[in-house]
Amino acid sequence: MNRQGKTPRFKRQRRLLTELPGMGKAGALERRPYPPGQHGLQRRKYSEFALQLEEKQKLRFHYGLREEQFRRLINKAKKSKATNWVEALVNLLEKRLDNVVFRLGFASSIPAARQLVSHGKVLVNGKKVNIGSQIIKVGDKITLKDEAYQNQVYMAAKQAPRLPLPSFMAKEDVAGKEQGRLTDEPNLEAVPFAFEPGLVIGYYSMRG
């Protein structure tokens, strides 16, 4: 990716002072570990609203969702039996097909994984699925079409995985081709960066 292509993603991560692996290449905070427009590590003052906004933006930007998409998942999470709806939200976010493809190491970012899915390169239990928002179930098998194992997106991710394989997934090599499964339900610990669930709850409790 060229410098222009990565700059907006890096700026968003710098503004949040958090590396968001789903956005792609690492290193957003390496050279300038402070927000755009700020010179050096000055102490920032936050309002409660600003803290809440930043925490929910971390999740939304990492998983690459528009606000309306994010809210739909929140509404679904709130209807679950979970005592903490943010945990139910994370469960849904982590089980989206585009994220599962990313976490299995088949793509180096969620946008790249979404592209594989939308181009019809991903199979769920042997059937093509081209909807990145599809929720994967425990036990589902995720593979790629034969030609996709030579795809540049897959090859780049295999050579330099963005994240280690999470504990709730498994992967094996079958006849020289990787396949993965969701083996357990993801919980809050599945999120690959630090965030405060209570602040996310606070943000949406004031906004319906």
Swiss-Prot record:
GO terms for cellular component: small ribosomal subunit. Pfam families: Ribosomal_S4, S4. PROSITE patterns: RIBOSOMAL_S4, S4. Keywords: Ribonucleoprotein, Ribosomal protein, RNA-binding, rRNA-binding. Coiled coil: none annotated. Belongs to the universal ribosomal protein uS4 family. HAMAP family: Ribosomal_uS4_B. One of the primary rRNA binding proteins, it binds directly to 16S rRNA where it nucleates assembly of the body of the 30S subunit. With S5 and S12 plays an important role in translational accuracy. This is Small ribosomal subunit protein uS4B.
